[in-house]
């Protein structure tokens, strides 16, 4: 990083009241600031108890000051942490004092971004920091910690090293074209390529599972009014999150709820009736429902077998994307005999279910996990993101194209290897555009 990087400061603890509040500061040559804050010269990595004072020497608070000298710190710069009482007024006064002493307010994720730019961690590890903070369940937290500790990165670095080794062999063939030697055959380049393809496939499979655990499954409930959508949402959530009445059309806005099934987050939207209306408020709810449908992975199509596929349900089905996966739910199974087969909703799976008794809920949950592609937590999994999966798919494609190259297409073979390496490098940040970095770190919380 440049020598002209400004000092940054932010509250590192969550907003609100608490027993302890932490101010984090990062920059160059912070000992003078530490002395101005507490009147003492702190030793690195030793907790210093002191009064934190304002410009007039009046105490703002008392607590611990921790000093981490560069480069042995999270960001790779000098870092100060002020640990005081966790009241919002105290935190604001301490932060303002830091700003008076020359710091500026940190941007979201800026501490972690500096750690990345100073080679304290790579991009996949940096994302692991945010994913650990945002983990939706225990499984996600465990896998995010593995990514933060570098498990995912080591797998990627292994792929990159293999690609570099193979590229060196290919470059040798390009450097000595006059030699009557089949370099690719002599160096077993084909065998090495096959090994790399298997390794990419393995990492991709793990990344896809990690992405499911991080990002979950988007599900919409659709069906005619009063068919039991809100009752099903409440049953899945285990709480009264949606209003249930005998009056058709009670739900006038999309109701969203997140549940965990075997640690996998499932984002469920109970849609307002997908129909035309002159009611302004209801129209807004319907537009939100249509947006939820466009973003969904699975639609639960609720049908009352006593009525079958009525005209209202047919109209709703016509609004669904043709490629959207569907599960047909025969609702209110406690009130009727199970119907044989489906009603032509386009669903491959039919489940009879009663939101009132809970009959069929477990079968629905298992089916949702199957639709998500979740295979269960296993050793070696790590949390991943969609961008990681896409990068690995790109590398997989380039290696597949390399395998199609003939023995006299060495330059094309080498180019596919290079592009596969670039795709892998995008995951760890070796080859990453600045605008993508901005997007990634802007989604962090301030102070991290």
From Swiss-Prot:
Please list the residues that bind GTP: 226-231, 245-251, 270-273
Specify which residues bind (6S)-5-formyl-5,6,7,8-tetrahydrofolate according to the UniProt entry for this protein.
24, 81, 120, 448
Q: Which EC class heads this enzyme's classification?
A: hydrolase
Q: Which residues form the TrmE-type G domain?
A: 216-373
First-listed, main subcellular location of the protein, grouped into a coarse class: cytoplasm
Q: Which SUPFAM superfamilies match?
A: P-loop containing nucleoside triphosphate hydrolases (SSF52540), TrmE connector domain (SSF116878)
Q: Which UniProt keywords apply?
A: Cytoplasm, GTP-binding, Hydrolase, Magnesium, Metal-binding, Nucleotide-binding, Potassium, tRNA processing
**Compartment(s) where it occurs, according to its Swiss-Prot or TrEMBL record:** Cytoplasm
Q: Could you tell me one molecular function GO term of this UniProt entry? A: GTP binding
So what EC number does this one have? 3.6.-.-
According to the lineage, what is the superkingdom?
Bacteria
Where, in this chain's numbering, is K(+) bound?
226, 245, 247, 250
Record-annotated residues binding Mg(2+)?
230, 251
Protein name (record): tRNA modification GTPase MnmE
Q: Which organism is it from?
A: Neisseria gonorrhoeae (strain ATCC 700825 / FA 1090)
As recorded in Swiss-Prot or TrEMBL, the protein's gene is named mnmE
């Amino acid at each position: 990083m440049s020598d002209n990087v400004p000092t940054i400061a932010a509250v590192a603890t969550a907003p609100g009241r608490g027993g302890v509040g932490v101010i984090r500061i990062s920059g160059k040559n912070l000992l003078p600031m530490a002395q101005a804050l507490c009147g003492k010269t702190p030793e690195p990595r030793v907790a210093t108890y002191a009064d934190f004072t304002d410009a007039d020497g009046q105490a703002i608070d008392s607590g611990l000051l921790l000093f981490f000298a560069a480069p042995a710190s999270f960001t790779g710069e000098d870092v100060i942490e002020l640990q005081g009482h966790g009241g919002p007024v105290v935190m604001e006064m301490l932060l303002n004092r830091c700003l008076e002493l020359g710091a500026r307010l940190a941007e979201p994720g800026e501490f972690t971004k500096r750690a990345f730019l100073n080679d304290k961690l790579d991009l996949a590890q940096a994302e692991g920091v945010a994913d650990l903070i945002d983990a939706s369940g225990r499984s996600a937290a465990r896998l995010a910690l593995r990514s933060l500790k570098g498990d995912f990165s080591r797998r990627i670095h292994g792929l990159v090293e293999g690609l570099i080794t193979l590229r060196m062999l290919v470059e040798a063939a390009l450097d000595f074209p006059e030699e009557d030697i089949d370099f690719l055959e002599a160096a077993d380049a084909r065998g090495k390529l096959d090994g790399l393809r298997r390794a990419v496939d393995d990492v991709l499979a793990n990344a896809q599972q990690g992405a499911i655990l991080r990002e979950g499954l988007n599900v919409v409930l659709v069906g005619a009014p009063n068919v039991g959508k809100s009752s099903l949402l409440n049953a899945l959530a285990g709480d009264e999150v949606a209003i249930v009445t005998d009056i058709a059309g009670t739900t006038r806005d999309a109701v969203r709820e997140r549940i965990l099934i075997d640690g996998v987050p499932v984002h469920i939207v109970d849609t307002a009736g997908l129909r035309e209306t002159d009611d302004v408020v209801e129209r807004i709810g319907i537009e939100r429902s249509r947006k939820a449908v466009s973003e969904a992975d699975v639609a639960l199509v609720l049908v009352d077998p006593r009525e079958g596929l009525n005209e209202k349900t047919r109209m709703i089905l016509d609004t669904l994307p043709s490629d959207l996966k569907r599960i047909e739910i025969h609702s209110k199974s406690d009130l009727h005999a199970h119907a044989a087969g489906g009603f032509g909703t386009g669903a491959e799976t039919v489940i009879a279910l009663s939101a009132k008794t809970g009959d069929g809920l477990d079968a629905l949950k298992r089916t949702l996990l199957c639709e998500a592609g979740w295979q269960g937590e296993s050793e070696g999994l790590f949390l991943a993101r969609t961008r990681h999966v896409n990068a690995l798919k790109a590398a997989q494609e380039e290696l597949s194209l390399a395998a199609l190259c003939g023995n006299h297409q060495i330059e094309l073979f080498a180019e596919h290897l290079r592009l596969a390496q670039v795709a892998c490098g995008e995951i760890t940040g070796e080859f990453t555009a600045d605008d993508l970095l901005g997007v990634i770190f802007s989604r962090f919380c301030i102070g991290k």
